[in-house]
């Protein structure tokens, strides 16, 4: 049995958070002790789901101040009391505070981290690079979720034997649905599943609605910082789209909502390996995504890519798919076939193999 602690800032909506909800029970069911430590333990649907699945969840605080220096002491105190074979971090604050806290603790715990994005604004700040290089050097293994993420991190910290790639995964069986048939003149429902954060490009999808007929409807699933949510809702009103766009917030019935949709979209400025893209591609609906790093590798050759930030190009490609039933069906089929390659069971097996390799090295 391996004792594993995963550490993440919170369980708000996001790809890394959703990965843990799917991954941790599988790691536990393989005969291991798998716990989770949150910097911000505020109650969320993801936290509730993990607790219902029997995962032990610890919290450092109930505040959204993950970079608070007090968290360094809190991590140190927690790791002093609890011993694990593997400590697996996610997100920058956790990646930094965990190795810092270990400096004064005599422990044999091996550190593993996952890079969940192909882009990080910190890497443009030259004065942070020495700290980042020290931080990454403390890890026995650094998991990148895609080829672009791997290349970008290799360029930043230099080539290292500790860098590997393990793709994210989802429970594809929960999302696989029969491919839908589009009927002439029917209402078309477009769905985008993404946290309302700066890296996502909801603005372009909203503006694309201005180029689509009135029978096209749009729904956003996800939440985020209140100021960003408010900004997008204000833009929706300014564009006169309030009667055609629905902000649905965080939902636990995403697979059912995708089943009722006709086209799934992900508009983003950058991505790692998006779990919502895998879910969307598994749903039996054509998947249309921004032509950006992370999505390009995932969607290219299966779904449809549109020019980053080009609302007219997005609208044209959505409408073309819906007006050409044969192509609609072919794209949906290709998307489902691609999604099956990213089942969470495959991801779990690769992480378990990695843990054994790290402990035996």
Specify the residue positions occupied by each region the protein language model found.
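A conserved nucleotide-sugar
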Residues: 31-34, 202, 206-246, 323-326, ...
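N-terminal strand-loop element at the rim of the active site
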Residues: 6-70, 224-227
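Short His-centered aromatic/hydrophobic patch
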Residues: 89-95, 115
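Aromatic "clamp/platform" in nucleotide-sugar-dependent glycosyltransferases that forms part
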Residues: 250, 269
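Short hydrophobic beta-strand element within catalytic cores of glycosyltransferases
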Residues: 37-38, 286-289
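Conserved acidic donor-binding segment of nucleotide-sugar-dependent glycosyltransferases
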Residues: 289, 304-311, 320-325
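A conserved mid-protein helix/loop that constitutes part of the nucleotide-sugar donor-binding site
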Residues: 14-25, 192-211, 230-231, 312
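Acidic anion/phosphate-binding donor-loop and adjacent secondary structure
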Residues: 64-66, 70, 151-155, 165-186
